[in-house]
Each structure stands twice: as structure tokens, then as C-alpha cells.
């Protein structure tokens, strides 16, 4: 996979995460867009379209090292407080919210990932993205989260504006909040943390089993999975992309970085089970 050939865009707020574990508090860069960029930067030249007022200089430098950074002006920076109850369960609270993303760069891309954290991507931007790239992926989560500060709330929403996407990722628990049928998108990826997930290609169902990884935390897993799947799907068929994305995500969880070889990903992908379901 040649880095530098493809031009891709990731849209969404990067986030200042305040993480509480017991009495310890740490601050770090987060947000679905950040984790998707981390993965996608392994496949293509990435542009990041985001919005914030201020972030620590080293975080901005990290974003710039991953791709071309475009920051829309905002009075606020999106910030969450994550309180870990155990490695897979956390309580999430929205502290502040940056400005919405109301325009895309005026050019074409090979792929665009729309990964909002709390409703910062309007419906017309989704429609515009579909005209700007042949492969458009999105994560459902940020489209059904309330932008109101306080404990994170999911809102029921008619998500028919996502129709026509190449790839839509969602957590199995989130799907009931959105009216999305598997036939309305090319590929629908439903994950359930470390448990088996479901994927649909043109409405046909498959079951896939993520690789077991002992992890201290799972933050960013779904966003890395979406970023990696998008990267592979630019050049590989559906099932191969699914297996490789699952392997890529397992290695990310193990290392908490994407600094591993693609040979290792391809080797590990052979251990991922994907089976067609008859329903």
C-alpha cells in the first residue's frame, strides 16, 4: 500500500480528554477524528478538518505530523471528562463544544471520513462529502450524541441523510437510535467491543470475530477500526478489508500506537473469522 498516492480527508472535532481513574487525572488528545486520522495516515496523505480554540502545542504538532491540519475558528474546544469504572466501562461527560464544521475544502478526495463527536457535522456537509469523494465513511456515534454539556446523551434521529455512504460504522447498542437500514449504505460495520460483530455488504449479513487482546483500555478502537477499514477498502475487497481492519485494530490496542508493519497486520488477519450469515 503506497503511502502518498491517495488523498484523504477526515472531518470532526479533535478533543481534549480529561481522564479520571480513581484519584489520578490525565489530559490527552482524543476524539474519533484523531483516532481515525492515526489509522488512515498509514494508507494515504491525510488532511484533517477540525475546529478548536486552544490545544497544547505538542498536541497540535502531533496532528501536523499526521497530516495537513485545517482548523476552523472557534471560541471553545470540545472537551470530555472520561471516568473509567473498569477497562471497558466508562462514564462520559461533555464539558464544552467547539464550533460546527460548516464547509469542506473545495477539492476532490479519494476518501472522506466523517467522524463527529457531538453533532458538529451538519447534514448538508454529508451530502457535499458524497460529491467530493468516491469513498465516504462515517461513524454513527457523533451524529446521535447531544451537543449539550453534561452526561453524554444519545438522541433518536432519522439518519436517512447517511444514505449512499460507502461505509458506516456503529456500536451495536447505538443502532436503535438511528433509522438506518443495512441496505441504505454499501457497507455497514457493527461492533460490540471485544464481542463478535456484524457487517453487511449491500444488505448481506456477515459475522466477524475480533481478535482477543488483553487491554488496559479500549478508547479509540472503533475509530481506528473505521480508519483502517477505509484505508484497506480503497484497494481491497470487503472481506479482506474487514479481516485486515480487525487485525490492525488488535495491534493498535496492544501497542496503543499504529507503529507496526503491514506484514504483521496481514499475518494476523488470517486469524480473523468472517462468515456469511443466512438471513
Which residue ranges define each predicted feature?
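Short, Lys/Arg-enriched N-terminal segments with co-localized hydrophobic residues
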Residues: 1-5
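Conserved N-terminal subdomain of the carbohydrate kinase-like
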Residues: 7, 16-27, 42-120, 124-135, ...
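Active-site metal-binding loops of divalent metal-dependent hydrolases
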Residues: 12-14, 224
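Alpha-helix C-terminal capping segments
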Residues: 37-46, 232-234
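Short beta-strand scaffold segments in enzyme catalytic cores
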Residues: 38, 80-83, 196-200
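Short, conserved phosphate/pyrophosphate- and ester-handling motifs at nucleotide-, phospho-/glycolipid
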Residues: 40, 171, 222
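Conserved beta-alpha-beta core of the PfkB/ribokinase-like small-molecule kinase fold
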Residues: 114-184, 196
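Conserved phosphate-binding/catalytic region of the ribokinase-like
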Residues: 154, 180-279
Amino acid at each position: 500500500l503506497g503511502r502518498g498516492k491517495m488523498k484523504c480527508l477526515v472531518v470532526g472535532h479533535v478533543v481534549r480528554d480529561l481522564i479520571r481513574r480513581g484519584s489520578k487525572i490525565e489530559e490527552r488528545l482524543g476524539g474519533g477524528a484523531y483516532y481515525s486520522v492515526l489509522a488512515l495516515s498509514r494508507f494515504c496523505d491525510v488532511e484533517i478538518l477540525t475546529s478548536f480554540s486552544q490545544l497544547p502545542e505538542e498536541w497540535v504538532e502531533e496532528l501536523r505530523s499526521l497530516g495537513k491540519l485545517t482548523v476552523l475558528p472557534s471560541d471553545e474546544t470540545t472537551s470530555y471528562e472520561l471516568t473509567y469504572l473498569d477497562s471497558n466501562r466508562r462514564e462520559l461527560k461533555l464539558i464544552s463544544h467547539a464550533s460546527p464544521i460548516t464547509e469542506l475544502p473545495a477539492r476532490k478526495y479519494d476518501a472522506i471520513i466523517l467522524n463527529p463527536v457531538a453533532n458538529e457535522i451538519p447534514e448538508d456537509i454529508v451530502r457535499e462529502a458524497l460529491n467530493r469523494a468516491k469513498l465516504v465513511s462515517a461513524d454513527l456515534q457523533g451524529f446521535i450524541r447531544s451537543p449539550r454539556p453534561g452526561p453524554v446523551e444519545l438522541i433518536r434521529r432519522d439518519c436517512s441523510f447517511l444514505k449512499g455512504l460507502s461505509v458506516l460504522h456503529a456500536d451495536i447498542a447505538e443502532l436503535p437510535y438511528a433509522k438506518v437500514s443495512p441496505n441504505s449504505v454499501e457497507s455497514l460495520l457493527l461492533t460490540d467491543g471485544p464481542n463478535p460483530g456484524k457487517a453487511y455488504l449491500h444488505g448481506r449479513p456477515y459475522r466477524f470475530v475480533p481478535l482477543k487482546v488483553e487491554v488496559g483500555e479500549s478508547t479509540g478502537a472503533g475509530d481506528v477500526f473505521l480508519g483502517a477499514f477505509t484505508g484497506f477498502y480503497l484497494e481491497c475487497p470487503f472481506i479482506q478489508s474487514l479481516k485486515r481492519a480487525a487485525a490492525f485494530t488488535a495491534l493498535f490496542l496492544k501497542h496503543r500506537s499504529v507503529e507496526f508493519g503491514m506484514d504483521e497486520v496481514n499475518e494476523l488477519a488470517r486469524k480473523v473469522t468472517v462468515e456469511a450469515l443466512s438471513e
